[in-house]
Amino acid sequence: MYIDVDYIKANGYAVMPNFLTSNEVKQLQDLCDNSPVAMGETWAGEDGKTEYLPDLDPNAYMHWWSYNMSEHAIVQQVKDKIKPMADKCFNGEFEQLGGDFKVTNPNSGYMYCHFDTPYRHDRWANDFGEDIKGMQFGIALDKFDDVSGGTRILPGSHKKIYHKEDMDAGKHNEEFLRDGVTMELEPGGLFCYHSRTMHSTMPNKSGKPRRLMLLLHLWNDPTFRQELQQEESKC
């Protein structure tokens, strides 16, 4: 499938409807529904606070994610389908990571603007080099829209200076809600974004869980990966 790398570099994202067949979607949905929880954010208690806890029942969370499920044939099949596009984004120098599910439960009000690896680290937070160091590829397993809490991104944000402490404090929420774009897709649609693009899961008002499979791709330059390993070890 064709991917416009120049468009991604200019806008920070791309959307590809109907990426998977209905059979592939069904296999991923079934796998997601039977995947154990690795970690998630619980519903707010009486004090209004949430907690990040592992291994609870899926309904105990606003949103949760599974363990890496790459050992399953259907996940590897999807990764293989993405490889030609990732190859163009990274000029052949990349590693596929991830292969886990992200689920947002109904009535979740979760929104958190952030960057992904490696740009979540201060070392690369405002790195605007030409080389793409990280890309996320997401597969919608339910209808993605403003009702279900489909992933929202802020186009062009990967080329502007932002600071994590400001995002954490919600200082860019108004801009994000005003100028952001929701990834509107039917099940089986794919979206991808430069990992430096500001994005967030959104509140789920659909009445049912909203499921996503996410696959991180990283630039495989040896020096960069060594530096990233050093940064990750500090977390």
Describe the role of every protein-language-model region.
Residues 13, 98, 132-136, 148, ...:
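Extracellular structured ligand-interaction cores
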Residues 124-132:
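Short, glycine/small-residue-enriched coil/turn segments at secondary-structure junctions
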Residues 115-117, 139-143, 155, 217:
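Short, structured patches in soluble enzyme cores that scaffold and shape functional sites
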Residues 2-3, 38, 42-49, 164-167, ...:
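Non-heme Fe(II)/2-oxoglutarate
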Residues 131-134, 144-202, 219-222, 233-234:
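Double-stranded beta-helix
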Residues 1-10, 17-125:
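Non-heme Fe(II)-dependent double-stranded beta-helix
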Residues 16, 139, 191-193:
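Short hydrophobic-aromatic micro-motifs
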Residues 85-95, 130-131, 141-147:
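Secondary-structure boundary elements
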